[in-house]
Regions:
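Well-ordered beta-strand positions enriched in small/hydrophobic/aromatic, beta-favoring residues
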Residues: 19-22, 52, 182
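ATP-binding/phosphotransfer module of carbohydrate and carboxylate kinases, centering on a glycine-rich
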Residues: 9-16, 38, 56-205
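Short beta-strand scaffold segments in enzyme catalytic cores
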Residues: 29-33
């Protein structure tokens, strides 16, 4: 929530009335800002995109497979790469970690994709599809003027932004896409602190 307020106040969404933030890193987070103020919901959990369903699996621990966080946060991306390697695919990621699969990070996968590693490109493509699905769900619910994409979607925009845009176009009606600005976040890790300061200042006025 605070990160969304920060981006809406002085970040990518500055001057825009209705903003939705969707960011993915270690976790998947979201936030909805309308008229400069966050929409928090009855329990302060509005915009909790990490719990949105993406995969209709039936598992005892839903947090590990099926929801946005499980599929597209860092651990989920790495898990897909490890699955591919264990299935017999060979990737330059293995060379980067000396075949220690426990050492694989998202950065290894992104770097390999930029170097035209086929397995990494496939993993990134699958990730972008899931990210686009989640983003489309947020847009459908909030109908914002701007969708701000943060975390790896900003740092790896060269790999992810266009596929996410394509997925939005596939999954949403034209009337909902027309006029929707899709931008990458600009405040990085400082967004939450900036947003918290904004809310604290508003509370004392």
């Amino acid at each position: 929530m605070c990160a969304a307020v920060g981006e809406a106040w002085v970040g990518a969404g500055r001057g825009v009335g209705d903003v939705v933030l969707f960011a993915v890193g270690i976790h998947a987070i979201g936030g909805i800002v309308r008229g400069g103020l966050p929409i928090t919901g009855a329990r302060g959990r509005a915009g909790s995109v990490g719990w949105v369903s993406l995969n209709p699996v039936e598992r005892e621990d839903y947090r590990k497979v099926g929801c946005v966080e499980a599929e597209v946060a860092a651990a989920g991306i790495v898990r897909r790469m490890i699955w591919r390697i264990k299935a017999g695919d060979r990737s330059r990621v293995q060379d980067a970690v000396n075949d220690d699969l426990s050492a694989i990070t998202v950065d290894h996968i992104l770097s390999a994709a930029r170097a035209n590693d086929g397995v990494s490109i496939s993993v990134v493509r699958d990730t972008a599809k899931y990210l686009g699905m989640a983003a489309a769900n947020l847009v459908a619910l909030a109908d914002p003027e701007m969708l701000v994409l943060g975390g790896i979607m900003a740092s790896a925009a060269d790999l992810l932004l266009e596929p996410i845009r394509v997925e939005l176009g596939r999954r949403l009606p034209k009337a909902m896409i027309d006029g929707l600005a899709v931008e990458t976040a600009t405040l990085g890790d400082e967004a939450a602190a900036i947003g918290a300061a904004r809310l604290a200042g508003a509370a004392v006025r």
